[in-house]
Amino acid sequence: MSTPRQGIDFFPLTVDLEERHYAIGQIPGSFFRREGRPTTQAILTCRLIDRPIRPLFPKGFKNEVQVIATTLSSDKETPLDILALNGVSTALTISNIPFNGPLAATRMGYIDGEFIVNPSYEQLNESLLDIVVASTKDGVSMMEAGATEIDEDIVYEA
């Protein structure tokens, strides 16, 4: 966290997700051995993290804050976005940064008439519903959903 920036009318929050190749047991083979640019999924995960945490900072807070979530290990079967969001919330909560958290997030899928909590990539491909909810003890902070044609009652139940 830096000192407050003068002359800006927004909260300068930067969220980065670093997906390291060593997390899945690979070492880049190029001459420079660099990790490269973030993937589209990493960019979408950064946005997923930013949306629910941004409103939990105090109004008028102008200090620049950078949040970097680094993948240390991955089984390549479980999406990392929910884990990263919960990790960021935990880190901000225990830091000295003024943050009105914590918040918790989960993803729900719906396969064969049953809800699946934090489904794998394979289960998400079969799922009729993909809904992510992030909330604090006071209420929902962010909800993101994607679905095929599905009954409204199922969405409400999720």
Q: Which role fits each region the language model picked out?
A:
Residues 46, 81-85, 152-156:
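Amphipathic alpha-helical transducer elements in NTP-driven molecular machines
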